[in-house]
């Protein structure tokens, strides 16, 4: 996997870690409310494995495009989305990780990785990654 994009955002000081986590979990369960061009998300499975919650989802985009992914929620810490390669897209991962370098100073780091050479990047897929 090759890192495609990474950025970090600072969270306003009035937002607590619990509130931030609740927002990240909501985004994992209902990404269609947050990602432009995503039309729906169906939760197919949910299991607890080694202390992390694993979700199986099917997400749909315009034009009838659908894909299945896996989401790993590590309570209060991170959300990782794993997409297996399909006919028209590469395998990829998307990590949202809470960082707190000092008490009350919250950040979320976003890391996008894909199994594709840089010259093969699909502009539409890249735009969706940057919006997530």
Question: For the regions a protein language model found, what residue spans apply to each?
Answer:
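Hydrophobic ligand-binding cavity/cleft-lining segments
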Residues: 1-49
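Short solvent-exposed loop/turn micro-motifs enriched in small/polar/acidic residues
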Residues: 2, 34, 63-65, 89-91
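Intrinsic-disorder/low-complexity, polar/charged segments enriched in Ser/Thr/Lys/Arg/Asp/Glu/Gln
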Residues: 2-6, 54-56, 105-107
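Hydrophobic/aromatic beta-strand elements that line small-molecule binding cavities or substrate pockets
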Residues: 7-9, 41-44, 67-72, 91-100
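Beta-strand elements of well-folded, non-transmembrane domains
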Residues: 13, 61-65, 112-116
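Short, surface-exposed loop and linker segments with low hydrophobicity and enrichment for Pro/Ser/Thr
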Residues: 14, 18, 51, 97-105
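Glycine-rich portal/gate segments that line the openings of hydrophobic small-molecule binding cavities
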Residues: 43-87
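Beta-strand/loop substructures that line and gate deep hydrophobic ligand-binding cavities in soluble
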Residues: 82-132
